[in-house]
Amino acid sequence: MNCKKLSKALLFLITALVIVSCSKDDCDLDHIDKLQGLPALKAGTFPEEDLTLNVGEQYVYAPKASSPLDIYYQWYQNGEDMSTDPSFTFNAEHPSRSKVILELSNDLGKVTLEHKVMVPGADYSKGCLIINEGWFGHGSGSISFYNYEKNSIEHWCYKNQNFGDVLGVTSQSATLWNGKLYVCSKEDNQLVVMDPKTLYAENSCGKLANYQAYEFIGLNDDYGVITHGGYF
């Protein structure tokens, strides 16, 4: 079989796989037409590789998209609603690790693009950390930092250093043990282990069975216990 025949065979196989993989209930020719009508991004107009900036620098996102219908833009940074303009400027105001999300949508659906921006230099060693339990039913716990030298407070430190990731619900305590910081929350992301200087997350355990987590107590280099409702 020559290359031309092989290409036709592969194209037929791919088309067949797409049609076969669609269920009768949620995927038909109309669905394929909708996919073809979604906003299309022009190659090279949205970064594909992670970006590193220094404090004080900025980066301008200026994607070029096309669609037979009107296109709507929605920008998020670490989960926060930032802009609905076609372009977006990321300002590296302080050290952080951020996830920028662009949603391109029209009446047929939505296309989502993600990009990570690193601004190195996080240092939370010259002050104290404040564990906020959060507003139950509305949001997760968080970490704030009081800077002794600047006499200022920075909020949402953990979230801003971990690409928008959040602690669990109703955060209770933070324990410094063997050079790591262990933060306990009652629900969801119940134990998060991080570097105490940068607050970069290194590990997490998600949900601990059906128990609430209150405090971590280190025993040795290999083991520790977590209190829950008066028990270990």
What are the language-model segments listed below?
Residues 2-9, 13-51, 108-128:
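Bacterial Sec-dependent N-terminal signal peptides
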Residues 148-150, 195-199:
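Short loop/turn segments that connect beta-strands within beta-propeller blades
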Residues 157-167, 204-209:
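Surface loop/turn motifs at the tips and blade-to-blade linkers of beta-strand repeat domains
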Residues 72-92:
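Surface-exposed, flexible coil segments in extracellular/virion-facing regions
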Residues 128-138, 176, 183-187, 218, ...:
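Conserved beta-strand positions in repeat-built beta-propeller and related beta-rich domains
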Residues 52-65:
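A short beta-strand segment in extracellular, disulfide-stabilized domains
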